[in-house]
């Protein structure tokens, strides 16, 4: 491992010990905001420290085994060779793990996020599939102990949604779900299809991190057009007799957000503004990222309809991720929320891309 990386790791261990000491300070314990921030930093540093400690131990084990290999006793030398082999494997594995732990962290990864699903091409079947996707993400959230809160839902006439927005509350929600942004295509025989023909439909998914209040950009009141209307259910059926639903248009960007889930106009407006802020910030970040990495592939989907990331083929029971050429034949498990087998390989590929970028820059 390079000397510069070892120096950085030693500095992180020093900081870990410093934070550990600070967490026992009565002054810090009395300041809840500071205590919370340091506790979070401590848990992040702990993983690196433990891994680096194991790496140094493996290095010591290798030196000891190499000394043992110089012994006159043949049995001891044979044992030493086995220990040398094991120590070298451990050093290689731990060095790779440390490199990943040292990769730049996305500050948004630990945050809650907004999940937006829109039915695309495919008529009624696209709306039904949007409902299936929401159920899939809800099941995944449940498995991770996260909470999902529907912000706005425009139900489709034959089930599912024309579009819907939900907030996912949970540690690391954005970090796990951010690679879900993009076009999701389904191939299956619709329930209404009498000839048994396979139809192709599509939905788009967009994942946006929740923006903390302190980081929300200033949005001028003059830049907003706010409309109120009566919230309605599927098929236009009114479910509220007051104009509590809110539609906010951000005039400079043309971004439109609707929220009609709450009976209170004030609550709907607050929810819509939170989603609007997330969309504006994400659009700015996506623009910056595109300018920086025109040539580098980006596994983070844009949420654009043309940006197809995954196909769900029901007749074959398969799911394919087109970004990394991954196909698994576990469709029913995936639709029940077992998304880890799809998410983990994309995260690993993303980390490999980051490592390659670092190698190019060094």
UniProtKB/Swiss-Prot annotation:
Keyword Nucleus: no
Transmembrane residue ranges: none
Residues found modified as N5-methylglutamine: 237
Pfam families: PCRF, RF-1
Record's comment on post-translational modification: Methylated by PrmC. Methylation increases the termination efficiency of RF1.
Entry keyword Cell membrane: no
Cellular compartment(s): Cytoplasm
Any one GO cellular component localisation term in the record: cytoplasm
UniProt keywords, alphabetically: Cytoplasm, Methylation, Protein biosynthesis
Gene Ontology molecular function terms on file: translation release factor activity, codon specific
Predominant place of localization: cytoplasm
Family as reported in the entry's similarity comment: Belongs to the prokaryotic/mitochondrial release factor family.
Function: Peptide chain release factor 1 directs the termination of translation in response to the peptide chain termination codons UAG and UAA.
Record protein name field: Peptide chain release factor 1
């Amino acid at each position: 491992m390079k000397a510069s990386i070892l120096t950085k790791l030693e500095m992180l261990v020093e900081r870990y010990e410093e934070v550990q000491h600070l967490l026992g300070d009565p002054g810090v314990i009395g300041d809840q905001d500071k205590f919370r921030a340091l506790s979070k930093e401590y848990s992040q540093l702990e993983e690196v420290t433990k891994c680096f400690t194991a790496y140094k131990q493996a290095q010591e084990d290798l030196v000891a085994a190499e000394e043992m290999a110089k012994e006159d006793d043949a049995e001891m030398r044979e044992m030493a060779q086995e220990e040398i082999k094991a120590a070298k494997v451990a050093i290689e594995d731990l060095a790779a793990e440390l490199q990943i732990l040292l990769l730049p962290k996305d500050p948004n990864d630990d945050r809650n996020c907004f999940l937006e699903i829109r039915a695309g091409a495919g008529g009624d079947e696209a709306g039904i599939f949007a409902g299936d996707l929401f159920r899939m993400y809800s099941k995944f959230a449940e498995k991770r102990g996260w909470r999902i809160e529907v912000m706005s839902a425009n139900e489709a006439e034959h089930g599912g949604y024309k579009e819907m927005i939900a907030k996912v509350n949970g540690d690391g929600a954005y970090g796990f779900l951010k690679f879900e942004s993009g076009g999701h295509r389904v191939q299956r025989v619709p329930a209404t299809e009498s000839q048994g023909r396979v139809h192709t439909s599509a939905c788009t998914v967009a994942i946006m991190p929740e923006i903390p209040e302190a980081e929300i950009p200033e949005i001028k009141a003059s830049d907003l057009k706010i409309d109120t209307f009566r919230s309605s259910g599927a098929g236009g059926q009114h479910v509220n007799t007051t104009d509590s639903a809110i539609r906010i248009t951000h005039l400079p960007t043309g971004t439109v957000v609707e929220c009609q889930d709450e009976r209170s106009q004030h609550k709907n407006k607050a929810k819509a503004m939170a989603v609007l802020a997330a969309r504006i910030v994400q659009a700015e970040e996506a623009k910056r990222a595109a300018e920086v990495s025109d040539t580098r592939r980006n596994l983070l989907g844009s949420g654009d309809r043309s940006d197809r990331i995954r196909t769900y083929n029901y007749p074959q029971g398969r799911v394919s991720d087109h970004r990394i050429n991954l196909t698994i034949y576990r469709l029913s498990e995936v639709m029940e929320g077992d998304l880890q087998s799809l998410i983990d390989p994309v995260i690993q590929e993303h980390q490999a891309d980051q490592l390659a970028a670092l190698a190019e820059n060094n």
